[in-house]
Each structure stands twice: as C-alpha cells, then as structure tokens.
Amino acid sequence: MVEGHTDDVPYKTGAVIKDNWDLSVMRATSIVRLITAHKGINPQNITAAGRSQYEPLLPNTNADNRSRNRRTEVIITPDLASIERMLQDISID
C-alpha cells in the first residue's frame, strides 16, 4: 500500500485538486504509477490511499513539522498465507 499524507493547511482550491484529501490521494497514486510502470509491480498487488491531514508524524505547529507531515509512505504487507505455511513447516521439523 502507498499512503499519501498532507499537513493541516487547507489546500487552495484548484481545478484538479479540491482539498487535502485529493492532494494526499494524488501523492499516493503518483508513486503507484511510478512503481508499476518502472519496477514491474503488478497493479493488482498495490493500493493507493490518501490519509489527508489525519495521520501526522508531528504536530502541525510549525513549518518544519508541516513539511515532515507532507509525505508518502510505502507499507509492505506480507502474504499471510505464505507466512502461515512457513510456520507450519517449521513446527513439523
């Protein structure tokens, strides 16, 4: 999963981006497009999500913190069925 994040400053409404929700989704989808186009990742195996301003790393109390909150995160989730099979194989040995 790729998550896009923003700070809490309202986005100035534009023709394409309406608010921080749109901006966070666009951040995530731009990374997803790069990964699927250039790294051979199957688009069925990746998700883009926008978190807007609602999961800040730091309080949005100054410019430096707001800058750190404007980010994109790549979250790698394991295939749980594969892990379960590996654990079963270990317990059998």
Question: Where is each model-derived feature located?
Answer:
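Periplasmic OmpA-like peptidoglycan-binding domain that tethers envelope proteins to the cell wall
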Residues: 5-93
